[in-house]
């Protein structure tokens, strides 16, 4: 496997009841690379939800990993990941905040 660290994923809004392990297991099933870290941040305006940042070392030998990265390179695009039919998460490329 060839791992390449490039793009972080963001799930902007997830119920607080969904565990980090559930998110981890869902992304492991996609077989897109090594899940390096999952960061949970509570949403400021709604304490029942959180934002998820997923750091991945991408396995670029997998077609799905390459397709996801290609789709998300344009930061306006998103993907839907179904975690429990019909429920899904909208996945975006993470845009790190800049300190000004």
Question: Where are the language model's segments positioned?
Answer:
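Canonical RRM/RBD RNA-binding surface and closely related RRM-like beta-sheet modules
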Residues: 2-51, 55-68, 72-75
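Low-complexity RS/RG/RGG-rich segments used by eukaryotic RNA-binding proteins and nuclear co-regulators
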Residues: 71-100
């Amino acid at each position: 496997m060839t791992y390449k660290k490039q793009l972080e994923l963001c799930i902007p809004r997830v119920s607080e009841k969904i565990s980090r392990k559930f998110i981890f297991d869902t992304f492991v099933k996609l077989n897109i690379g090594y899940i390096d870290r999952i960061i949970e941040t509570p949403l400021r305006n709604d304490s029942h939800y959180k934002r998820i940042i997923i750091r991945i070392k991408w396995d670029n030998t997998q077609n799905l990993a390459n397709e996801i990265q290609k789709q998300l390179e344009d930061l306006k695009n998103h993907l839907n990941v179904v975690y429990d039919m019909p429920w899904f998460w909208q996945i975006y490329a993470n845009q790190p905040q800049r300190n000004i």
